[in-house]
Amino acid sequence: MREVSDPLDLIKEWTVRDDDVEFVSGSHERRRLGLLLLLKFFEIHARFPSNLEEVPDGVVDFVARQAALDAMSLESYEWDGRTIKRDRAQVRDFLGFRECTVAEADLLVEWLVGNVAASERSFDRVKAALVGRCRSERIELPASGRLDRMVRSALSQAEDAAIATVARLVPDNVAERLHALVDDDIDDSSGELSTLGWLKSTPGNVSLETMLVEIDKLRRVREIGLPAGVLDSVPSALLVEWRRTVGVESPSHLRRRTAESRVALLGTLLQARERELTDTLVDLFIATVHRINARADRKVTKELVEAFKRVTGKENLLFAIATAAVDAPDEPVRDVIFPAVKGGEVTLRELVYEFKSKGPVYAQTVRATLRASYTNHYRRGLIELLDVLEFDSNNSMHRPVIDALELVKTFKDSRVRFFPDDAEVPVHRGIVGNWASLVFNNDLPERRVVRTVYEICTFQALREQLRCKEVWVHGADRWRNPDDDLPADFDERRVEHYTALRQPLDATEFIDTLKAEMDAALSALNDDIAGCDWIDIADRGKQGPIKLSPLDAVTEPSSLRALKADVGRRWGTIPMIDMLKEAVLRSGCLDQITSTASRDGISPDTLVERLLLVIYAYGTNTGIAAIAGGEHGHSDNDLRYVRRRYLTNDIAQAIAVEIANATFAARDPEVWGAGSSVVASDSTHFRAFDQNIFTEWHARYGGRGVLIYWHVERKSMAIHSQLISCSASEVAAMIEGAIRHSTDMAVEGNYVDSHGQTEIGFGITRLLGFDLLPRIKRINHVKLYRPGPKRPGDYSNIADAMSRPIQWGQIAEQYDQMIRYATAIRTGTASTEAILRRFMRSNAQHPTYQAMIETGRAQKTVFVARYLRDRQLQRSVNDGLHVVESWNRGNSVFFYGKGGDIASNRRDEQELSVLCLRILQTSLVYINTLLIQDTLADDRWSRRLTDADRRGLTPLFWSHVAPYGEVRLNMARRLDIT
């Protein structure tokens, strides 16, 4: 028998009512308890138990006591035969249910097909919908096997119906071109990709060649001519499934499908690839324009540095030159000036180089070099880009750049130096300022516009406006119309969205609350600062007004070292594969797996073993080929097949989430304390292959690679991971993980370092309803804003750190729009990074940006005022970040293969490696949690740990784990854990 986990559930589900007793009173005394159990079980599950083993422990006695029946009478109850059939019929009649006939089963499947199975593709959720439908229709649930067959039938029929609809909408000539995509496979002799493989391939590194290849791909996709809207009727969940399926199938696999299925899958691929390629080209454009500028800057700097030697004593030098010139004004320079200077001509040349290396001459030289680089190399790709991308803007202020692009396209093949006099040249902010002297030629009688320089300035202006999404691209996804990022139903569901964010509908109420918090925090700091010997606020000029003493170092308690040693003695050295196996078997996380293919010829036990090995191969970065040689009986091809068909990134994410949830459920509060609602997040750098547009140079880490952004809670369990580029916003990554981690944890606060906080970040997190708790590196320069106008005597003890009042009027005016953006992040209508692009400094004049900044400044003031006077908060932030830093140290221990480099240029492969590493480390934390609890249950440890020991207790250690060596997977060998 299973157990009832919660006593409240026992009371809620198995309480006997008076009418229940009356219902069984007419039956023979020996049948009453069995009949009553059938009744209560059916009320809970809408089906009957097949035997007594399905009834939870403790239920029989609980029910018998309530009904004043003898529990022993159940021993004579027959669970098979005419009696129980009669009892079941009685229960159905009493509750108003009926058996599920063949006709009703067909109707249920038909209902699933029309209402659920197309938009929801999860087997478990479709099954739950079927169970709910049976209850509402008062139909007894079919047997488990029959129920599963009904669900599978509904999923299949819904997909077939969608496929048929798409196939009807695709013209015959387009269908022929789609079929032609799978006519060829990889050429084994040359190794060249098939046409389909080429279209699915990822872009190379940022270069002109990559840009031209991606342009060719986009043109090839568009040449097929898939009609617009042909897939609009297909639910997004089914499109995601089709996209995943066609992504892993080769041309030969697709050829074995029906023609209709092939058209639907390939059409889905082309629609998705058109958006992806458009996004990629925008990324390449932004990176290329930046590269042109950066390389010109480096080239000029290198040339000048090589010739540069700083000249000292310039005042004396100037005096000597002036004296010589005045004394002999008519003599040649070489005869008068050179001899007057120590070092002669050489010194004067060095002075010229020094002047050129800074100021306007240097900038002018950089711009000239940039022009040459653009004209001689990059122009070809950037101009061709204009033929395949359509730019647009919703803001009339930025229309001149769009008009300028049309002018550039008009003269793209022209060789003239200047635009013709009759050409209408749009004036935009990219051609004014420092570039004006190069854009406009003033040597001619009439001022003329230099065409190539104008193109450069236009592309630079376009880049800046794309980055903040003031200019957007038709047919893109990440770079689409920013209005599409916002929830379309916001106006109709405004109250619901405000309630979900726990924000008031009235802007005045929001402002009054925030203003009161500011005043309370500032007043508390002002009143308490005299007693806080760790903080001093005074005017220190450039050093900043705030002086905060560092926290005292805390050493690891000796008892914790002894505890870890005891764990090692009791269980010995545990191979990492066994830690993973134990976590998977105990958590049941592989129950979440659904295949990306339709056929399943692998037994569940074999599938579990192969998945464990693939996860281990990716998580350790050793690779499948290395793991295939271990003691487990699975070949390289077997493992690669399972990887391709079963282990998607979504499934790996679900596995990690299930292990985290299992850890939370297994924790003993007496050991670990109450659950926390605060996480810490930080990034760490991984070197990675760089023949892709995602890998970037990171100045702080000094190498090319990617960043992994982790969210880890106080007891060392990672709840979220993200693979981001080195230039990505860590604030966006922080918000994304805090609200979309999918675990059972409710996040109410987030510790970050300086890279994870900005004033925009403070504003967004305030609206989203959780606290941003940063460790600010340059806290000495932080300014505290006033909640209202300055008055004599206000905050006099902290006056040197005070700044201007918050502009509450801007917040009130843009409050609803800010809530709209926060709702977009909460509901996921667009990625957090896409939303936050609207709040970049280059878009500082946007009114919503200004309002968000003011909100962030107010919230940051509240936090900093609390932080400065609360030593415990400082330590909590520091301890939380120490946990995520310890997690980062573990990365190098377990991700040891190939020198720790992510050895793939494919984004999905890189993400899977990170997810599998997360699975390994969450498995370690899960099993260590159980090992520690078992160890502390020993009488020797019952009173040994102090409060300080318990605060420092962590399951993130690996002194007893063997991450290296031959992989020996034995599913029968289990760890002896309670």
Residue spans of the language-model regions?
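Long amphipathic alpha-helical coiled-coil/heptad-repeat bundle
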Residues: 2-518
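Glycine- and acidic
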Residues: 20, 565, 597, 604-613, ...
